[in-house]
């Protein structure tokens, strides 16, 4: 198979935000008006069903057998399908139509060379692992397969996205929960959550990602309402009356009291608001990340993890690695990648060194990948088509072994040559890092048990 199915999303998902532009200020400042995930207008909004879902999630993840830890994940999603040949798996001895317009450079690890578009990553190669043999044969032009880490999770002809399989972030939300209960466990920093971030499938809306643009103002008290007033539990209880019907019949009023108190703490702690206050960051660090959409999201991801979020997905504009040719929005390989890669390169390299400087890197697993690779031969429009035979990805942190390359593609970047790494292997590695038993099963809508890792999936042995 050398191409993916038809485009899975229509043009309506191609937003105007560019990965080169700074983030809109409503994502950067505390006090965003968009509170739709947890808090609606006024104090009464604290009782929205999404809040109830989150509070029930806390009760679920605090059940016996779940050991809280500080392990977290940041997933950079390179929407559109990044070219493995032009980034992490260069073919310098191949013909020009295969090797493309870019050169290669040495890295900090002797013997490992990557595209000359990635000098910052080359400088921290000892902290990175490149996997050049990722099996993306089940994937299509959506985030579903790779973000779920499951070959059966994909867009199907009947429109039932993902076959009900949840994303790795949703599994993390259910079985690891948040690091800090004052924050949601799964956050998406993406321009288009629907197009770029896969959610919970049939696992339930409780475990859906919270969109970052909504998070900045989630937990602020409504205008004119003091924290002292919010802390008045009798007042809060009256305003939560309509939550009663959403609680299971077996839930006692004691449980409702717990949910209420937790909601109060979410507001009173101010942790979500503080996490979005980047004004406290050193301007030089912000410059290093890049004051662009992808750079500022990477910085926010670090702040989310630092504050207590478990799983964060970072994505730039929808499809911004979909480099079919110079006639389309994101252009071809040279015109598309040359201006884009300095921003992506800086964002990843700075995040890794920043996490290390703060003592967070061993607890934070960082992944960078897309849905598939791109064709070995450059087309007549100076682009590369979709390619599902093989792709490359990068991992860092997580207390794992780095400074290595795992697997390889053939001389043309056409197919996997050795050490195939599957989506389920990636999922097993992520869940092992998070302390989640990879044999765990959940109950689908059919009532049958479903493994969180597809058959055959094992943690990547070279890393762990």
Residues covered by each model-derived region:
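Ligand-binding pockets and gating/stacking loops
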Residues: 2-464
């Amino acid at each position: 198979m050398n191409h993916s199915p038809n485009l899975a999303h229509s043009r309506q998902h191609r937003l105007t935000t560019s990965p080169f532009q700074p983030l809109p200020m409503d994502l950067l400042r505390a006090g965003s008006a968009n509170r739709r995930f947890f808090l609606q207008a006024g104090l009464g909004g604290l009782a929205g069903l999404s809040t109830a879902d989150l509070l029930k999630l806390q009760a679920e993840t605090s059940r016996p057998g779940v050991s809280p830890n500080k392990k977290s994940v940041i997933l950079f999603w390179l929407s559109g399908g990044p070219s493995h040949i032009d980034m992490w798996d260069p073919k310098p001895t191949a013909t020009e139509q295969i090797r493309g317009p870019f050169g290669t450079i040495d890295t900090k690890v002797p013997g490992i060379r990557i595209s000359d578009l990635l000098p910052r990553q080359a400088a921290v190669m000892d902290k990175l692992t490149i996997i050049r043999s990722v099996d993306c044969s089940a994937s299509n032009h959506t985030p579903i397969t790779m973000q779920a880490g499951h070959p059966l999770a994909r867009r199907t002809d009947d429109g039932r996205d993902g076959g009900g399989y949840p994303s790795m972030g949703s599994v993390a939300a259910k079985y690891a929960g948040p690091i800090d209960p004052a924050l949601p466990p799964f956050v998406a920093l993406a321009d288009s959550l629907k197009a770029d971030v896969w959610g919970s499938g049939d696992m339930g809306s409780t475990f859906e990602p919270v969109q970052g643009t909504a998070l900045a103002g989630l937990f602020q008290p409504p205008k004119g309402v003091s924290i002292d007033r919010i802390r008045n539990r009798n007042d809060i209880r009256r305003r939560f009356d309509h939550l009663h019907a959403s609680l299971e019949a077996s839930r006692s009023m004691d449980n409702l009291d717990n949910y209420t108190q937790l909601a109060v703490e979410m507001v009173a702690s101010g942790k979500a608001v503080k996490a979005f206050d980047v004004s406290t960051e050193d301007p030089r660090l912000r410059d290093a990340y890049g004051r662009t959409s992808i750079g500022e999201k990477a910085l926010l991801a670090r702040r989310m993890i630092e504050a207590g979020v478990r799983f964060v997905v970072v994505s730039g504009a929808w499809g911004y690695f979909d480099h079919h040719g110079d006639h389309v929005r994101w252009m071809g390989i040279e015109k598309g990648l040359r201006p884009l890669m300095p921003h992506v390169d800086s964002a990843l390299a700075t995040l890794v060194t920043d996490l290390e400087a703060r003592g967070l890197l061993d607890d934070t697993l960082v992944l960078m990948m897309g849905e598939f690779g791109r064709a070995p031969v450059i087309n007549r429009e100076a682009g590369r088509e979709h390619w599902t035979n093989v792709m490359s990805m990068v991992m860092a942190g997580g207390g794992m072994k780095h400074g290595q390359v795992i697997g390889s593609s053939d001389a043309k970047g056409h197919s996997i040559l050795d050490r195939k790494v599957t989506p389920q292997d990636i999922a097993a590695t992520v869940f092992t890092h998070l302390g989640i038993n990879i044999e765990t099963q959940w109950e689908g809508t059919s009532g049958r048990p479903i493994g969180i890792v597809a058959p055959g999936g094992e943690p990547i042995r070279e890393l762990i």
